UniProtKB/Swiss-Prot annotation:
Any one GO MF annotation of this record: transcription cis-regulatory region binding
Main location, first listed in the record: cytoplasm
Domain of life: Bacteria
HAMAP family (UniProt xref): MraZ
NCBIfam families from the UniProt entry: division/cell wall cluster transcriptional repressor MraZ (TIGR00242)
Disulfide bond keyword on record: no
Name of the protein in question: Transcriptional regulator MraZ
Gene transcribed to yield this protein: mraZ
UniProt organism field: Shewanella baltica (strain OS185)
Length: 152
């Protein structure tokens, strides 16, 4: 399970180093293989360990190619999907189209989301946090069916 936000740097070759605490689980459970694709609702990237991505692919396979919305979803997620492997230094290469999609420059945030990571431009991440906090403050959580019984 991946949790927490880590500030990392994008090097001049377009690589990022995965934080050390995640490398061993990624190597042992997923052979160091990760699939990177776009988030369809935010300007960030999604990084799935290979076995998690295979579950996503099974769901995508069930979508219709004749339904415009379903086909569009498949086209975006699969069209941008790029499999990478951790190198000996725990780095992965982010292809240019993916870096452009998420406006990634030097400072990046890698954010654990349990079964995957989100990869954000640092400033976009800070803005997103503000938006999330505003959403939580403005909505009555008890009126949200899935959150009504959620407690910390």
């Amino acid at each position: 399970m991946f949790r927490g936000a880590s500030a990392i740097n994008l090097d001049t070759k377009g690589r990022i180093a995965i934080p050390v605490r995640y490398r061993e689980p990624l190597q042992l459970e997923h052979q160091g293989r990760i699939v990177i694709t776009v988030d369809i609702q935010s300007a960030c990237l999604l990084l799935y360990p290979i076995h998690e991505w295979e579950l996503i692919e099974a769901k995508l396979l069930k979508l219709s190619d004749t339904d415009k919305t379903q086909r569009s979803l498949k086209r975006l997620l699969l069209g941008y999907a790029h499999e990478v492997e951790l190198d000996g230094n725990g780095r992965i290469l982010l292809p240019p189209p993916l870096r452009q999609y998420a406006n990634l420059d030097k400072r990046i945030m890698l954010v654990g989301q349990l079964n995957k990571f989100e990869l954000w431009d640092e400033q976009s991440w800070l803005q997103q946090i503000d938006e999330c906090q505003e959403t939580i403050r403005s909505e009555e959580l008890a009126s949200n069916e899935r959150l009504a019984d959620f407690s910390l």
